[in-house]
Amino acid sequence: MAHKKGVGSSKNGRDSNPKYLGVKKFGGEQVLAGNILVRQRGTKFKAGANVGMGRDHTLFALEHGKVVFTNKGNKGRFISIEVAQTEVAAD
């Protein structure tokens, strides 16, 4: 007979840290250059006009303007920035 009680080790009991992925700025929102639009794994969304992509596939605004989402079918879903036209007053 054993003199010590058998101690089992659990294979569960751990969890990864949250990654906070997803859309950060939605369609129609005004953004500043550098604002993060989407954090994603892979290219669920692709970069359209005035949008850059980081090395972890994060999409960010390159210009000030309004966020626009477009679905181009087989080509995928694109996010672009519609730059606001600034009118110059004539003196």
Swiss-Prot record:
InterPro entries: Ribosomal_bL27 (IPR001684), Ribosomal_bL27_CS (IPR018261)
Similarity remark: Belongs to the bacterial ribosomal protein bL27 family.
SUPFAM superfamilies the record matches: Ribosomal L27 protein-like (SSF110324)
Lineage summary: Bacteria, Thermotogati, Deinococcota, Deinococci, Deinococcales
Biological process annotations from GO: translation
Any Pfam family matching the protein: Ribosomal_L27
Entry keywords, A to Z: Ribonucleoprotein, Ribosomal protein
Name the record gives this protein: Large ribosomal subunit protein bL27
Record's keyword annotation contains Ribosomal protein: yes
